[in-house]
């Protein structure tokens, strides 16, 4: 138990610093060398797709079996027997809850859903993407709007146009990111086995670092002062450690109520991973017209790495 607690505390510290570094580096890099940021687009995209594979394995090879196992223990305490797929239902409830949260943010937003003019972006959308929609959970790095280049057929996105991102939009992005970051942290904090903590940490660290990079790019393009950017970055970076802390508190609770809360929250967190994989990462990355087969390869590679770790009980 002591080793497990130490592992979770190390995860808290690790994810916090990965996210903090990921969100603040773009603020300096884009200000000093936009071309360097442009060249890193492909690397970020492949890392994001690799993260999608990691989350697939996390959801179906680690979280779902854990929820099933804990659910069986909870039901046996109440002498309840059922063949209904309760674990899968709880996981999908988490998925629907995350979809609802995203659509709620879009519905009540007075401003446009993207950090840039959708008309400007969509006028040149045939350059690199088939999409005309930008999720509020995704910054420019994941939607790749920051890197559309002029090809001489219609308006294209200029570097100067990117600086119009308002602080209100940045704050709404930070809120949206924080909302499901807490659930990702909960999933880590609720784990009872060391190998599952490690596999979850890899998935969360890869994904959340890329999320932080997206936030950092948005802050850089909005010309946010470094001090304010640091405050926002610290706030968002603290959400996963907060979730891990909440998970630790719930996991330490004794009796049936603590077990029920643990299995429900773990299942809902699994639904959040499902949302991130299919609607955030894959929906955006695989619609890009470049490197599609390479992205599929990285997706399978990400899944294989985590599935192998679960199989070997590493």
From Swiss-Prot:
Primary location recorded for the protein, binned into one broad class: membrane
Record field: transmembrane: 4-24, 43-63, 86-106, 170-190, 197-217, 230-250, 263-283, 293-313
Gene Ontology BP annotations: cell morphogenesis; embryonic cranial skeleton morphogenesis; in utero embryonic development; limb development; T cell homeostasis; zinc ion transmembrane transport
Keywords: Cell membrane, Ion transport, Membrane, Phosphoprotein, Transmembrane, Transmembrane helix, Transport, Zinc, Zinc transport
Cytoplasmic side, ranges: 25-42, 107-169, 218-229, 284-292
Subcellular localization, as worded in the UniProt entry: Cell membrane; Apical cell membrane
Post-translational modification Phosphoserine, affected residues: 125, 129
Catalytic activities: Zn(2+)(in) = Zn(2+)(out)
Keyword Chaperone: no
GO molecular function: zinc ion transmembrane transporter activity
Keyword GTP-binding: no
Extracellular topological intervals: 1-3, 64-85, 191-196, 251-262, 314
Membrane-topology descriptor: Multi-pass membrane protein
A cellular component annotation (GO) from this entry: plasma membrane
Superkingdom classification of source: Eukaryota
The family this protein is said to belong to: Belongs to the ZIP transporter (TC 2.A.5) family.
Biological function: Transporter for the divalent cation Zn(2+). Mediates the influx of Zn(2+) into cells from extracellular space. Controls Zn(2+) accumulation into dentate gyrus granule cells in the hippocampus. Mediates Zn(2+) reuptake from the secreted milk within the alveolar lumen.
PANTHER family found in the cross-reference section: ZINC TRANSPORTER ZIP3, ZINC/IRON TRANSPORTER
Protein name: Zinc transporter ZIP3
Gene transcribed to yield this protein: SLC39A3
